[in-house]
Structures are given as C-alpha cells and as structure tokens.
Amino acid sequence: MLVGVSAAELRTDPARFQGQVLKWRLQFIAVEIADDLRPDVPDGATYLLARGPSPEHGFVYVVVPDAKKALVASLAPLANIEITARVRVGRSRYLGNPVVDLMSLEVRP
C-alpha cells in the first residue's frame, strides 16, 4: 500500500500508479452519478467528488462499489475522510483528475 503519494504524482506518471493501492486523506464534497463527461468512471456508477489528498486542493473521483453506497450516503459535506483505494486512472481523460476505486473509508476529525 502506498502512503504519501500525491495526486500531482499520479497525474504526472499515470501508468506507474495504475492498479496500485494507496491510502489518502480527502475532503468529501458530494456523491455524484457518472455521466459522459467522466468516461473513466462507468456510466451510471456512484462516485464521490472529493478534494485532496491533503494538503492538495485538486479534485479526485472515488468510484463507490455497491456494498459501500449506504456508508457514503451518510457522509456530511466537507467531512474529512481517509480512504484505501486502487488507482483506476492517474489522470482522467477530459478533466485530468485521478480516479480511484474505493476499498475502505473512515471518517476522520
């Protein structure tokens, strides 16, 4: 598991990080449903829009598996979360943001 990897590193060398598991601290913004603007996220999939990882302020897309939908539905906007996730795409096609697949999530103070 990678710790301390920045989103900027993923964007700079996306192939190096694809498939890697990492731990990130993020700020939750909203739960969204994927559309055509995010082709790296399966159409209709639930994902989190988040900022980070701390101390960065760029956006990250966190794809949520069905088993975790109830957990993320209870998150308050701007909550600090720590996730373990697998890198799907280090730099998304249109917007350039990392896309990761959620494995675990904890709310942090």
Task: Give names to the regions the model predicted.
Residues M1-P109:
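OB-fold and OB-like single-stranded nucleic-acid-recognition modules
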